[in-house]
Amino acid sequence: MTISWSELVRTAAEESTAALEKGADRNWSGTAGDLQWSARETLSHIALGVVGYAGLLIARPTDRYITLFGSIDSQAPAPAALEGIRIAGTLLATTVDTTPEEVRAWHPYGHSDRTGFAAMGALELLVHGRDIARGLDLDWSIPDELAAPVVSRLFPDAPTGHAPTDTLLWCTGRVALPDLPRRNGWRWNGEVR
């Protein structure tokens, strides 16, 4: 990997929010891509996940989720809401930087380490950022160099021979690949390998 795990999170936050800022004046109450959530609800989901992953690395529970829940103010204008996403990304990236390699924490998709939680956070930022961009009719694609480490870390059985972004979108049930139909159900594997 040519980018550090913390820089992956920071860059995913910056790239996705910069793309979404171009749609700040659009209707954020519409659905985010094929999700049932609105663009605003999806932002809160991203914040919840990314802040939660930082909290898991800090608290290090072995059998439960943490009790801190982060969200975006539903009344905040889009630029301020996106600032909240960048803050969440910075919190996770800083936590990844300061967490020792041997630390493990609970997650329902497998106890994980700092690299796993960084990849989970980047996935939330990138994939849901794309969902929102699609809902706002913005032209934005996940950069392959950000998708590749996420696929490598969270989807050990991912198909090979495709662009990393296409593979990530297939792994998360967003698209079909040649000879592989779109997935109806999916989950990542955060376990340490």
Predicted regions and their residues:
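Extended, alpha-helix-rich binding/interface surfaces that flank or overlap catalytic cores
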Residues: 42
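Glycine-rich loop at the start of a catalytic domain that most often binds anionic cofactors/ligands
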Residues: 45-46
